[in-house]
Each structure stands twice: as C-alpha cells, then as structure tokens.
Amino acid sequence: MDALVMAGGRGTRLDTDGEKPLSPVAGRPLIDYVLDALDASGVASVVVATSPSTPETAAHVSAPIVQTPGEGYVADLDAALADDRLARPTLTVAADLPLLTGAVLDRLRRAHESGSLTVAVPAARKHELGVSVDTTFDHDGRTVAPTGVNVVGGEPSRTLVVDEPRLAVNVNRPGDAAVAREWLRS
C-alpha cells in the first residue's frame, strides 16, 4: 500500500507565522514525525501533497511531491490521488499527527479489508486528552472524530473506531501542540 501525506493546508487555526507542516513541536517539524512513522511502517512508498501555501514544506521533505491547487482538503486530496505514483488503495495521513508510529499505521493497514476506511477516535478521548475537537459524527451510537488517517480505495466504505491516543492528537491549535509536546517528552 502506498501512502500520501496531506501537507498543503494553511494552518490558520494553529496561529503560526510559518507553514503548518513545518511548525515545531518538541523541536521538530510536525511533518517529520509523520514521515518517520511512515518510514517505520510497511508502506510501499510515500508521496507528499503540498500546495501553493506550503512551498517551504515541499523544499524540506525528501519524499516525492505532488503539487495540489490549494483549494481545500477534498479538492487537494482528489488532485493528489490522480497522481500515477499512487496505487489504490492508498493510505492517507495528515501532516499534523506528531504522535503517530509505524506500529499504529501497520495496525490500521491490517484492519483495512477492502474499499475505503475512515479511521476515527471517540470524541470523549480527545476531550480527556485536552485536544481540540473540530469535527464529529455519529457512528453506531457513539460520537467520534476523524483522525486524519484514512484508506482511500473505493466501495464499500466503512468506519473503524480506535481508542488510540496517538491518533487523537492532531495539532490544529496551540493547545494541541502543548499536549503533543507533553506526550513526546514523556
């Protein structure tokens, strides 16, 4: 399975002067943690999706780049997935998950059976950790939040809910960065 890192967002909620994927957490850029996790996983290859908003990120990474139009997550995802270097199913990972590990990614890849997979965590877990919850949806009577990790394949599409703190901490706001720093230092 190939992997696509989504690294084209402006990161306006993070309130940083620089590009979000390069925002430091515990002394390292966010995207470096994600790329290290992918390197430690069993993915076949990694492509990074950047946009006109993230030229320094494109220069920073050594992985192949696909330039997207910077028109929002869904439009950029569609543009990136059209790149012929990515075979379906494709593991997609947001660049703002500094606690991610290769072992967690491999568990998710093994959980993928066919089609597409949306990976979510209980919203209650995010609240317990003290990180922001911007989007939620109901799944089997539980309020869950998307993690920023998915498998894009086709139909059928299913949701996998995992109570994994490493997937619950995505850095969208300054408080999220503080929580991630504490985890990385412990």
Model-flagged regions — what are they?
Residues A7, T50, A94, A120-V121:
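Short beta-strand/turn micro-motifs composed of small residues
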Residues R13, T54-T57, L99-L100:
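Short, active-site-adjacent cap segments at secondary-structure transitions
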Residues G18-P24, R166:
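Short glycine-enriched, charge-decorated loop/helix-capping segments at active-site entrances
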Residues G9, D96, R173:
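Active-site glycine-centered loops adjacent to acidic/histidine catalytic or metal-binding residues
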Residues P24, L30-A94, F137-H139:
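Conserved N-terminal catalytic core of the sugar/cofactor nucleotidyltransferase
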Residues H60, L100-S186:
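Conserved core of the sugar-phosphate nucleotidyltransferase
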Residues M1-G18:
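N-terminal nucleotide-binding beta1-loop-alpha1 segment
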Residues A3, R88-L91, L117-V119:
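Generic beta-sheet signal
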